């Protein structure tokens, strides 16, 4: 057998032969140690140093590609977390259902009953509060299909929920014109001179300024008095000018209070309405609340009787609703009582008493209906200061029996002129001088049934009975049992 070779001797022999070759090539021992270390590191023999340089170069390139600061890392993270921009046009505007939109009622959330920050769903017309997560509006948008477009009831801004981005689209302007009735000075002047017809969503035409009013909570007297006061030109101009569209763009569009006489008058004269009628619901609710706060002892039946009676409603309006400035400027005058030793008395309306109804029947066994001329009822009075608008009230048209508590109606018919009502001036009272009397033309007449017959700017007469509006002849105005009248002073012919 051949002898076994020792591994250590072989390694020493190889190292000595390698040292001899390095000396022959002019190297040194340090360089040889470095090369040997490279060999052990790379396990590749002679090509080690070249591959190490390539590896270092690759490491430098990788370090250059990586971000070097924390700010750059944060910016990159923010860019990836930023939500996408909202679309230029909302894809859900086709689901806006205008026939279901009704802004006449109290603006209160239908879920939480909150008044603040309320939105209207333009698909179903219901009111909801909030816009953020877990709010009634946000929940409604998630639960109902295609109910995504909402409009703020105070400023008219539209949003798409639950994505929560604002919608800027001109197609919603007609909705804002119903939510916020606005008028230019030219439109107000035009409304005072000519009749304007408009078309509702259902295709029916209605006359702007003579629209039906929905009767709410036994308030028939409210409807008739509102229709009558809407004929007073200066008062109407004051209400419409409050929502004037200014040329400088500084419009008061931030508040939308639909529980005032001003807002109700604006809706009556708005030519952009979706319907040919409107509702005084929120206005009547506010009146009831004010009365309950001022007179807690009053019962609901007492308030019902107040708003069912046109004359009682008129007194309440002139005292608490119509601005005092316009009451004094338009309706206040001074009356000379000729049958009380020429006593002078200021007035807002002239109270007139009808003759009592006869107690006995005529020869035909029928109750005779008495008649009296308005001129006869005005004989005991003379105007010392003539107001621009004269209100006449037949205060004993209804009377209450003190024993039975029953209300009876006086059926006396009053004959009156539609034009050129003459009322004597105080200078002619008790003297033989022939001074010119004051002349008045009729604007509105309210009968005992609560129907208001009003004169429009085109000279035609219209009978309004809650939601129903019919054109009538001037001769038909004097046929009913008149209760309250409004006249306008004109130049004597």
Residue ranges, per PLM feature:
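UBL (ubiquitin/ubiquitin-like) substrate-recognition surfaces
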Residues: 2-493
């Amino acid at each position: 057998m051949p002898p076994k070779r020792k591994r250590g001797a072989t390694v020493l022999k190889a190292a000595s032969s390698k040292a001899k070759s390095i000396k022959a090539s002019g190297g040194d021992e340090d360089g040889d140690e470095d090369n040997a270390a490279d060999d052990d590191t790379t396990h590749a023999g002679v090509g080690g140093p070249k591959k190490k340089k390539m590896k270092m170069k690759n490491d430098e390139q990788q370090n250059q590609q990586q971000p070097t600061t924390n700010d750059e890392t944060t910016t990159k993270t923010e860019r990836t977390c930023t939500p996408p921009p909202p679309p230029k046009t909302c894809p859900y505007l086709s689901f806006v259902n205008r026939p279901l939109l009704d802004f006449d009622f109290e603006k209160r959330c239908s879920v939480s009953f909150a008044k603040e920050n309320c939105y209207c769903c333009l698909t179903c017309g219901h009111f909801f509060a909030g816009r953020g997560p877990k709010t009634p509006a946000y929940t409604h948008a998630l639960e109902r299909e295609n109910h995504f477009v909402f409009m703020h009831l105070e400023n008219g801004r539209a949003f798409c929920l639950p994505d929560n981005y604002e919608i800027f689209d001109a197609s919603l302007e007609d909705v804002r014109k119903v939510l916020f009735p606005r008028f230019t000075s030219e439109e107000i002047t035009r409304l005072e001179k000519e009749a304007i017809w408009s078309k509702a969503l259902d295709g029916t035409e209605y006359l702007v300024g003579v629209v039906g009013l929905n009767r709410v909570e036994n308030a028939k007297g409210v409807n008739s008095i509102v229709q009558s006061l809407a004929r007073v030109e200066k008062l109407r101009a004051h209400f419409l000018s409050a929502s004037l569209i200014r040329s400088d763009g500084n419009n008061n569009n931030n508040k939308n209070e639909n529980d005032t006489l001003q807002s109700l008058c604006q809706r009556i004269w708005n030519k952009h309405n979706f319907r040919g009628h409107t509702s005084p619901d929120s206005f009547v609710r506010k009146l009831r609340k004010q009365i309950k706060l001022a007179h807690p002892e009053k019962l609901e039946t007492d308030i019902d009787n107040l708003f069912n009676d046109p004359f009682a409603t008129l007194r309440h309006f002139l005292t608490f609703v119509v601005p005092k400035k316009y009451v004094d400027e338009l309706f206040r005058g001074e009356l000379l009582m000729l049958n009380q030793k020429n006593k002078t008395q200021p007035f807002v309306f002239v109270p007139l008493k009808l003759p009592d109804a006869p107690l006995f029947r005529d020869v035909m066994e029928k109750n005779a209906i008495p008649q009296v001329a308005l001129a006869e009822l005005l004989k005991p009075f003379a105007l010392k200061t003539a107001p621009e608008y004269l209100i006449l009230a037949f205060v004993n048209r209804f009377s209450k029996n003190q024993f039975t508590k029953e209300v009876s109606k006086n059926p006396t018919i009053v004959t009156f002129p539609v034009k050129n009502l003459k009322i004597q001036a105080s200078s002619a009272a008790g003297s033989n001088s022939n001074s010119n009397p004051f002349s008045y033309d009729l604007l509105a007449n309210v009968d005992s049934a609560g129907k208001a017959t009003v004169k429009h700017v085109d000279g035609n007469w219209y009978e309004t009975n809650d939601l129903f509006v019919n054109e009538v002849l001037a001769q038909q105005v004097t046929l009913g049992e008149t209760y309250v009248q409004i006249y306008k002073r004109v130049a004597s012919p």
